[in-house]
A protein has these predicted regions:
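Membrane-embedded catalytic interface detector for glycan/lipid assembly enzymes
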Residues: 32-35, 91-95, 123-256, 260, ...
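Hydrophobic alpha-helical segments
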Residues: 200, 374-463
């Protein structure tokens, strides 16, 4: 372990100790205490990004995007609370007391700090690793063929899934996708195959020449996918598809210039307005949907950044709600949800009425039933750490950070080695779903998408 890594790890440990000392000395929740925790959060995310920058020399990489997303979803409202800017219609204070939020804040900071410490410990600079030219050329050919195969196989299921979603949204609105009216026959099988469509496009993107017609066609398809996502009322996958495209260009083609970043920032502001409008209008009619988006953006009272972060930050809800149920009403899981998630590799061949993973590892469904809610609240990595290990959940987050770094860090995955870069951006594409879900989704992403692609390419290279 080099001196820089030791200093970064020590700085994070010291920082979280200071946060906890403040929390312990001011155990009675007050508005000032909540704001102070928000300030600690600002400092912690800045320290995390700065430490990653000085350790790796890069900042706009898959791991950093995942880390920022984790903070925005798990701590976003606390960031805004420092400035009294939380959108009232999204505020967690409508469901929880100051004391509930205060406890959730310190727990979230501890877990996210542990996650990043795990990543720092896992980081290993492999920039000097050289891939043999003949192996790299074989990987290009194999990945290109694999991309064509995945796109051709997933195309029809992808189209079917999206047409069904469009019909449901047009008929029942956004909520129809998640209610009884949104049930799709064989939806799981179709969705599993359809989800290979974008990874297939990413295979083709990485093996196409920059500026070529094939690359431009792929970006046009990405744009159409994003429009379809927004029409259906979704946003997360559209945002991450944009982020993956920028990651590809910045880390695989050539670094983006300062002028380019300015242009992207201006475009990002406009995109935030659109995303905020989508969130506001997605429950309504689709008759004049895109015209309504334009009209909503002209509202001077709308601040897209505040609206967007307020909604993202409401994902602290599962943690705060779980803390009110466990351990008072139900006991801790002691790692069982992680173990049951791993059993999802075993198909249900009639041994069970419901697969054990579906019963014990889908914690969003558990929370919906335990809290007697009429809608699915989702879940989070931090909430799952709590329900399993309580105050010691940070240990699970440290281990998770270690392995997430191994997958997401493109230096540790040998820079521009095409296979490992491909796996990193596929994981990034799937990662926003993971932040707002339980561990079982991470297992499924690895099992159904990343491992098959990895082992297929490695097997073909060795032939």
């Amino acid at each position: 372990m080099n001196n820089t890594k030791i200093l970064c790890v020590a700085a994070h440990i010291l920082y979280i100790i200071i946060c906890y000392i403040y929390y312990d000395a001011n155990s009675n929740a007050t508005s000032e205490g909540l704001k102070m925790m928000g300030l600690f959060g600002w400092g912690q995310i800045a320290l995390s990004l700065f430490s990653w920058r000085i350790l790796t020399g890069k900042i706009f990489v898959p791991y950093a995007i995942f880390l920022v997303a984790a903070y925005l979803f798990c701590f976003g409202q606390s960031f805004l609370g420092v400035f009294d800017l939380i959108a009232e219609n999204r505020s967690l204070f409508r469901s929880f007391s100051e004391s509930d939020i205060y406890i959730a804040q310190i727990y979230t900071l501890m877990c996210l700090a542990a996650f990043h410490i795990g990543a720092l410990l896992a980081y290993k600079n492999s920039k000097n690793f050289v891939v043999e030219q003949n192996i790299e050329e074989k990987e290009y050919i194999i990945i290109n063929k694999l991309g064509k195969f995945l796109v051709s196989v997933a195309f029809i299921p992808f189209i079917i899934e999206n047409i069904v979603s469009l019909v449901i949204v047009s008929t029942y609105g956004y909520n129809g996708l998640y209610g009884e009216t949104g049930e799709i026959p064989f939806g799981t099988a179709i969705g599993l195959i359809a989800d290979y469509f974008v990874p297939g496009l990413l295979c083709l993107l990485l093996t196409s020449e920059p500026g070529s017609k094939s690359q431009k066609r792929i970006f046009v398809i990405f744009a159409l996918i994003i429009l379809g996502i927004m029409y259906c009322g979704g946003r997360s996958q559209g945002v991450v598809l944009v982020a993956v495209s920028i990651l590809y260009y910045q880390n695989y083609v050539k670094p983006i210039s300062k002028k380019g970043w300015i242009t992207l920032c201006l475009g990002g502001i406009m995109f935030m307005y659109v995303l905020t409008a989508v969130a506001h209008l997605r429950g309504g009619s689709r008759d004049n949907y895109f015209q309504d988006i334009v009209a909503y953006q002209s509202d001077d009272d709308v601040n897209p950044a505040i609206e967007l972060v307020s909604e993202m930050g409401s994902s602290m809800f599962p943690l705060a709600k779980t803390m009110k149920i466990v351990p008072d009403t139900e006991d801790y899981r002691y790692g069982s949800s992680y173990m049951y998630a791993l059993t999802s590799v075993i198909p249900n061949l009639g041994f069970w009425d419901r697969h054990p993973a579906a019963v014990h590892a889908k914690l969003g469904q558990w929370l919906r039933e335990a809290a007697n809610m009429s809608y699915g609240p989702g879940y989070s990595l931090v909430a799952e750490a709590y329900i399993n290990f309580g105050a010691f959940g940070f240990v699970a987050m440290l281990i998770m950070g270690f392995y997430f770094c191994k997958i997401l860090n493109i230096d540790d995955t040998r820079g521009h080695h095409i296979l490992t870069f491909l796996l990193a951006i596929i994981f990034t594409y799937m990662s926003l779903k993971m932040v707002r879900n339980s561990f079982i989704l991470t297992v499924r992403v690895l099992l159904y998408y990343m491992l098959p692609i990895y082992y297929y390419v490695r097997y073909k290279v060795r032939l």
